[in-house]
Amino acid sequence: MKAIVQVRGEVNQEQGVRDTLEMLNLDRVNHATLVPETDAYDGMVTKVNDWVAHGEPSADVVATLIERRAEPAAGEGDIDDEWVADNTDYDGVEALAEALVDEETTLQEAGVSPTLRLHPPRGGHDGIKHPTKEGGQLGKHTTEEIDTLLEAMR
């Protein structure tokens, strides 16, 4: 599973990039989504690589994101262990996070909104104009790097 975070805005975006971000359920800066690792999603991520940060997060970070930032797809409320037990096949947030990381389910299948609206990163971005190889935020991150970014945006 990959976490994809939109880091850059719409200025100077081509229409194809905008359409791809919309297909990924990313319509604003600092929004994130969790997608399975398939060829179709890999192609989409390649296309929007200059606008997003992406990587494979750990289950602990996914659980934190679900508890703090996830919203039910229908209705309002917070996602906690009780909500997960009542509305999904899983016992709690940790079990749902493990299932997401293992690609047993998706956010939509679990009844959770596919878009996670995150806070801007505490301490700021490392740079939204440069890829990770040059010390920026754009492109592919290691598990530790994406975990650090998502923790800062929790």
Curated annotation (Swiss-Prot):
Example GO CC term: the record gives:
cytosolic large ribosomal subunit
> GO MF terms on file?
RNA binding; structural constituent of ribosome
Segments carrying the region annotation (Disordered) are 114-139
Q: Where are the transmembrane segments?
A: none
Compositionally skewed regions (Basic and acidic residues) per UniProt: 123-133
Q: Which InterPro entries match?
A: Ribo_uL30_ferredoxin-like_sf, Ribosomal_uL30, Ribosomal_uL30_arc, Ribosomal_uL30_euk_arc, Ribosomal_uL30_ferredoxin-like
Kindly state which keywords UniProt assigns to this record, in alphabetical order: Ribonucleoprotein, Ribosomal protein
Q: Which domain of life is it from?
A: Archaea
Q: Which GO terms describe its biological process?
A: maturation of LSU-rRNA from tricistronic rRNA transcript (SSU-rRNA, 5.8S rRNA, LSU-rRNA); translation
Per UniProt, subunit arrangement is:
Part of the 50S ribosomal subunit.
The family note in this entry says: Belongs to the universal ribosomal protein uL30 family.
Q: What NCBIfam families does its record include?
A: PRK06049.1, uL30_arch
Q: Output this protein's name.
A: Large ribosomal subunit protein uL30
Which lineage ranks, top first, belong to the organism behind this chain? Archaea, Methanobacteriati, Methanobacteriota, Stenosarchaea group, Halobacteria
Q: Which gene encodes it?
A: rpl30
